[in-house]
């Protein structure tokens, strides 16, 4: 599996959070595509 994106934490900048969530969504898509 690809590495899970790192959570930037509660005091992260909004841009960091947006980047993290888009990376996380991409990561989940990769995993679910491999599984099924």
Swiss-Prot record:
InterPro entries: Pancreatic_hormone-like, Pancreatic_hormone-like_CS. CDD domains: PAH (cd00126). One of its GO terms (biological process) is feeding behavior. Coiled coil: none annotated. The keyword Kinase does not apply. Its main location: secreted. It holds the Pfam family Hormone_3. It comes from the Eukaryota. The keyword Secreted applies. Keywords: Amidation, Hormone, Secreted. Belongs to the NPY family. This is Peptide YY-like. It comes from Caliraja rhina (Longnose skate). The lineage of its organism: Eukaryota, Metazoa, Chordata, Craniata, Vertebrata.
